[in-house]
């Protein structure tokens, strides 16, 4: 079984992934944010570093998806290849951070990759307000995230809604975290 956890930056994906893995004995797969050689530069100069950063994430997420698809273990995954493309890459393209050539190349690569794998059995989408996201981002203290513009998070939230409602074709469970200040407490109750 493959469960993917989707949600904006700071929504509680890692928290929920950890909780589900512990509770059900599933193997957790975490997004490797500490090992992306472009991520810190990306937050300093988004336009310059969008394409290499997005390609790096695509490569890593596809590698994870291949390993998951070849495994007999039940896996819970923190962020999927699908939201990476339909939320983050499309947002960068819409903001003018990717030109048409880079975007088209990226999308062709993504389509070729996803022809080789299946959708997760279930995607759990963590819907959260921007104030909730900012609170969690501040709490975890990653330096490169601290100067993230609020409109960037707002745009990502809009893209997530489009992704879940219009683009993703697999099964989805949505958990709303709009009015809570403690994601771990809220997710424990779920």
Feature-to-residue mapping (PLM):
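Conserved small/polar residues in nucleotide/adenosyl-binding loops
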Residues: 179-184
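A basic- and aromatic-enriched beta-loop-alpha substructure that forms the phosphate/nucleotide-
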Residues: 61-99
């Amino acid at each position: 079984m493959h469960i993917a956890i989707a949600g904006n930056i700071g929504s509680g994906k890692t928290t929920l992934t950890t909780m589900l893995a512990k509770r059900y004995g599933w193997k957790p797969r975490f997004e490797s944010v500490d090992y992306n050689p472009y991520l810190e530069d990306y937050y300093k100069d988004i336009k310059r570093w969008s394409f290499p950063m997005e390609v790096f994430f695509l490569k890593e997420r596809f590698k994870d998806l291949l390993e998951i698809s070849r495994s007999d273990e039940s896996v819970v995954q923190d962020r999927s290849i699908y939201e990476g493309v339909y939320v983050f890459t499309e947002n960068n393209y819409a903001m003018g951070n990717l030109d048409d050539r880079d975007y088209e190349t990226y999308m062709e690569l993504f389509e070729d990759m996803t022809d080789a794998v299946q959708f997760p059995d279930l995607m759990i989408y963590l819907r959260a307000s921007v104030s909730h996201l900012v609170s969690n981002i501040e709490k975890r203290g990653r330096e490169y995230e601290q100067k993230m513009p609020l409109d960037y998070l707002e745009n990502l939230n809009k893209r997530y809604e489009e992704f879940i409602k219009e683009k993703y074709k697999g099964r989805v469970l949505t958990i709303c975290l709009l009015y809570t200040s403690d994601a771990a407490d809220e997710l424990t109750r779920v």
